[in-house]
Amino acid sequence: MSNRFAVILAAGKGTRMKSKLYKVLHPVCGKPMVQHVVDQVSQLGLQKLVTVVGHGAEMVQEQLGNVSEFALQAEQLGTAHAVDQAASVLANEEGTTLVICGDTPLITAETMEALLQQHKEAGAMATVLTAYIEEPAGYGRIVRNENGHVEKIVEHKDANEKELAIKEINTGTYCFDNKALFASLSKVSNDNVQGEYYLPDVIEILKNEGHIVSAYQTEQFDETLGVNDRVALSQAEIIMKNRINRKNMVNGVTIIDPSNTYISADAVIGSDTVLHPGTIIEGNTVIGSDCEIGPHTVIRDSEIGDRTTIRQSTVHDSKLGTEVSVGPFAHIRPDSVIGDEVRVGNFVEIKKTVFGNRSKASHLSYIGDAQVGEDVNLGCGSITVNYDGKNKFKTVIGNGVFIGCNSNLVAPVTVEDGAYVAAGSTITENVPSKALSVARARQVNKEDYVDQLLNKKKS
């Protein structure tokens, strides 16, 4: 196989997005558009990948990191001019170069591989990715010769009646013989209304020089969708969501209502897990097998063990073990590690806490900056008081501890193994192992007090 290279065009202003965010960084199913493209082209066995950046260059470079080399198009003078900015990296290379836009998040490695194979088999200097659509208005038409090769690409506004009837359109993705590409770029003129250098002109240059220009027609027109405004962004979101949901269902995940279930492109979900409506799985989340998630649950960048149930709750940047029960209406905040067979009940918030196996906080509790041992019971209304207005402090609860209802543990404080804390206590000092700690005022009953009070008000 000859050397392969790719150029991703990501320098456009994206003015139609009407956004402060650089266009190709707008997310589709939780991942920036350009990252979708890079992830797919990276599966093609490339020797070099160059992303052409312009506005917001630093943000794109930060997003892609060292996966790609970068070329700067400081002034946007057209697509041919954009590709030419990669000359310092690629111009002297032998091989085939794929050129694709960074705002086509739905393109797949399979389609690009088919394009490259068609290019090779046809012995072409350039190959165009095309698609057949019933309503081709606005698209450039593909005019083929008697051999089935591309004779020319005609823009809609320049097409005659016969050419307007053609329904095979140019999608804007190409592959070229690398040296022929960069040799032709220097011949492209900007003698047009916009005064720009257009990449399709390279096709005409190569054709006029007697080279074969081939085309590969994809049956997946949706993959070629370019996102230029918020309407197209929403269309891409729907298509990607359906693709992701279908893939998960085919792999053994039950999605009760796919139209109301959102799964990120990078999420991994085990078989026989059930997702109820309103479930949102974001980021690099991994969910095990035989889980039940939702309804109305958000999980982001977290790891969920097998046979875990999460109902109407939120989990962020945390790890949950096996056979955990969460919710309804619980919130597990970042940097929490929940053990196996744990119960986190309704209106419980856990933050930056290690919560041991078989421990329970069944309702109305806040556990923050804490280390909770195994087999611990935190009664209703248990609070770790971790913040003094300036600094956060740690609470340590040993194994087998029982915390009574409506108790405050004022950090820094340790409750050692097997200790009991009486309901209503405010603990400010360490509790020894197996001790009962009572930290509340003794109850006083004042006999006949109510009658005395009422008589006083009457007088």
Curated annotation (Swiss-Prot):
A Pfam family it matches: Hexapep
Entry-linked InterPro entries: Bifunctional_GlmU, GlmU-like, GlmU_C_LbH, Hexapep, Hexapep_transf_CS, NTP_transferase_dom, Nucleotide-diphossugar_trans, Trimer_LpxA-like_sf
Annotated segments matching region N-acetyltransferase: 252-459
GO BP, sorted A to Z: cell morphogenesis; cell wall organization; lipid A biosynthetic process; peptidoglycan biosynthetic process; regulation of cell shape; UDP-N-acetylglucosamine biosynthetic process
Catalytic reactions on record: alpha-D-glucosamine 1-phosphate + acetyl-CoA = N-acetyl-alpha-D-glucosamine 1-phosphate + CoA + H(+); N-acetyl-alpha-D-glucosamine 1-phosphate + UTP + H(+) = UDP-N-acetyl-alpha-D-glucosamine + diphosphate
Active site per database record: 363 (proton acceptor)
Chain sites annotated for binding Mg(2+): 103, 228
GO molecular function: glucosamine-1-phosphate N-acetyltransferase activity; magnesium ion binding; UDP-N-acetylglucosamine diphosphorylase activity
Keywords assigned by UniProt, alphabetized: Acyltransferase, Cell shape, Cell wall biogenesis/degradation, Cytoplasm, Magnesium, Metal-binding, Multifunctional enzyme, Nucleotidyltransferase, Peptidoglycan synthesis, Repeat, Transferase
Stated role: Catalyzes the last two sequential reactions in the de novo biosynthetic pathway for UDP-N-acetylglucosamine (UDP-GlcNAc). The C-terminal domain catalyzes the transfer of acetyl group from acetyl coenzyme A to glucosamine-1-phosphate (GlcN-1-P) to produce N-acetylglucosamine-1-phosphate (GlcNAc-1-P), which is converted into UDP-GlcNAc by the transfer of uridine 5-monophosphate (from uridine 5-triphosphate), a reaction catalyzed by the N-terminal domain.
Protein name: Bifunctional protein GlmU
Upper classification of the organism: Bacteria, Bacillati, Bacillota, Bacilli, Bacillales
Gene name of the encoded protein: glmU
